[in-house]
């Protein structure tokens, strides 16, 4: 089986009417750390395991 490169795309919203954002993290451990730091202030989060790498993608909140 081929060892494919991947990253985690986490899309989130801080409150029902609040800002939404997206961050790219390299591994599930990083996702867990982010959730532990930010979980209390997140209304929802969507986690996607994406093929490839996150080079050139910018974390943002709008």
What are these regions (language model features)?
Residues 1-19:
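Short aromatic-glycine-(Arg/Gly/Cys) micro-motifs in beta-strand/loop hairpins
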Residues 17-29:
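A short, exposed loop/beta-hairpin motif centered on an aromatic-Gly-Thr core
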Residues 8-10, 25, 31, 35, ...:
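Hydrophobic beta-strand residues in large extracellular and virion-surface proteins
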Residues 13-16, 34, 51:
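N-terminal start and proteolytic maturation junction detector
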Residues 36-62:
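Short, mixed-charge low-complexity intrinsically disordered segments
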Residues 2, 20, 31-32, 48:
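Generic alpha-helical structural signal
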């Amino acid at each position: 089986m081929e060892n494919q490169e991947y990253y985690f795309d986490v899309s989130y919203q801080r409150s029902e009417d609040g800002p939404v954002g997206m961050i790219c993290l390299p591994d599930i451990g990083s996702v867990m750390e982010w959730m532990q730091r930010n979980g209390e202030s997140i209304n929802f989060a969507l986690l996607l395991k994406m093929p490839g790498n996150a080079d050139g993608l910018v974390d943002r909140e709008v």
